[in-house]
């Protein structure tokens, strides 16, 4: 069972002489049957939760007066103000004292009041008086009621944070034995999901009470926004979701007046309420309404984040959807779905997961498991899901989904943007790509295309030219008038975040992090020590592969989003992390890459005429330096290829690459090797450097020794040589491309950041947080040299961590681990497909003559149509109707009109008053018991 938080020790948990009146009062209010039967103990949350109110917030005299009054009042029975005075034995002498205690109890959440609930479906009744004498008071339930009201009182919570624990316990203990017996509609317990209104606008059978606009119109003029009790309470328990806790709860009718008058909220207009609802939908929050007063009254609309919501927990923890679910269920049109995963990412319950659209080899469809329901099953703790917030974030079924999305480190919705491109919706395709990658134009030129390596179409003939299509889509981003600037979606009702975040390093990881922080509403600052941002994109990749205007165009979009980039600033030298903290920076993302080059450890390795590939390429990228004579490049990877090709294109007469590995085992890609040879680079394999020959400390040649093996019996890089077999090459310039190193200088001086192998930082594998809690790391500085797309993916994840950290959210609860499974390509049946062969963009022969111009063409629109038609459409979203609660958030995320809500369970819109709950629970429980018996009998017969 979920244990109570141990964040705080309730002050009154072990009272030796508890107030008997308080014991009696909380025993009356509680709906925990266990507590009612055995009596209230001081260790019960009912007692210590209210003891901090009656013992610490009130004087002894006030407490006695308050409890005497409250004990005379029946639970949830409304008493006119004059009747309350009479119950309190008010007279001319103590009238002010009684009024004061009534007001105090209202502010503290022990009393609730309204002005007669004078509303109709057409709106508020006219001429309703709203003075003190017009109020009706009552003792509220714990939930929904006083537990929320205490948690909505920020000052009270700050004095008594154990009230957050009280709220959490009172949404668990009374329900753990009941939820399985609750019928559709919730039986007047707690809260009820109400769908996104647009999602049900085409349904003919909807009821007024299923529409948010109906309730807002009913109470128009009496609407208010308040602190979200769940968000604030969970934040107090260090389990926050990182949302701003202000104004997500909309009080309606007299509740809005109650909250405004007791300091819990403020008035808002109908339009302001609708704006909050839209903002909630943008963030993926679930709309819920109170469900304890029947179908003619609600008192709040909540916009709930499943990571912290105590109401949604009642259905998700216990796996009992009747506690929350609306009358609707999601349905996917497989013919339209492209497995982009947007609906999956936002589904609060995990009802949506990515699966397989293609048939299995035997022609059958993959069968997906369904969540068992308590309707005809025995229920207990073995059926609960205590990790529901994490399991809801599992992206796909174990049988797998589209290989392209799985293989991509950033898990871009490849199938989705190919479909949009096929429809000519290029801007929408670009938007979809940028959900996961802010550098589509860059990656369209330099990505190593793991998506294509795994493309299912490759099993038939050739993979789809995914990267070429992406490049075409991204071309519009290069023109200022057509650039797509993403919408800023902030989990706050107060505008963009004020917290300052520093990103140290302006390479792909740092800039990706900045992009996604900006998209969440921050104004991050990037500190880059070089004159231009981009890191290895700018200084490491030759311009014939990636021209700098492409990088600059995509960086310009980040600036438009609010990213500030400060170049020429070296943190640790020009300013320290400590100084940045003093300037208000709350967190740091260190993504400085591996900007140093490794040396081979041989004689004369630093002689004049030697360079690391990193430094050589940086110089070349900042002004094409002319070369001549003989150049030797030591190394067999893609960086070595780049250095060799740049040297050749810069005028070197002879360029020779020396690789330890055989040609078949070279780290460089086959495509890169062939292009290098086409440029005139000579490659010799199976040799390593022994010594640099010099004359007057200037390199003149390289002595090589035969490499016998590269990998040892433990599968580790551990080359061995035949020192007797030597070879000598003439060299005017020797370039080492044998690895990269981290150059820290004084960047982390004085911090607690720990280091592992070599001088790489140690960080949590999920959050990237270091031992210095406000410092996070990522990109090549953490992983070692990898591809741009790997750094981009890490930067995206780092943005999530930084957001959670600066907003005091929990670092891992409800976090998408971004884990995907590839479908079994050996167990599929592809019966029909477009027979077109793979399309290549080709090369511009004129540009090819210019050594540092990108001569690769972009696909034409017609070629894009042909190429996108080759996609087999492997993946699809699968709905588990048993887990779906009909919130409709999925429909707001789908760009393909592939998911919709259907009114499958109209009985779930039955709203009843809390006092009648057992009139509905008991008959349902009896039917359920009968079903379970018959199910067992049928099972026994089999």
Regions found by a protein language model. Give the residues of each.
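A conserved FAD-binding loop/helix module that cradles the flavin
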Residues: 781-806
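Flanking helices and flexible, charged tails adjoining ferredoxin-like Fe-S electron-transfer domains
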Residues: 349-403, 418, 464-500, 519, ...
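Ferredoxin-like iron-sulfur electron-transfer modules
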Residues: 41, 93, 137-139, 288-301, ...
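Iron-sulfur cluster-binding cysteine motifs and their immediate structural context
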Residues: 64, 78, 85, 109-116, ...
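Glycine-rich dinucleotide-binding loop and its adjacent helix/turn
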Residues: 473-494, 553-573, 597-650, 755-771
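Short, amphipathic alpha-helical interaction segments positioned at domain boundaries
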Residues: 122-173
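Beta1-alpha1 glycine-rich phosphate/pyrophosphate-binding loop at the start
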Residues: 412-415, 421-422, 463-467, 503-571, ...
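FAD-site-proximal beta/loop scaffold in flavoenzymes
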Residues: 606-630, 711-785, 800
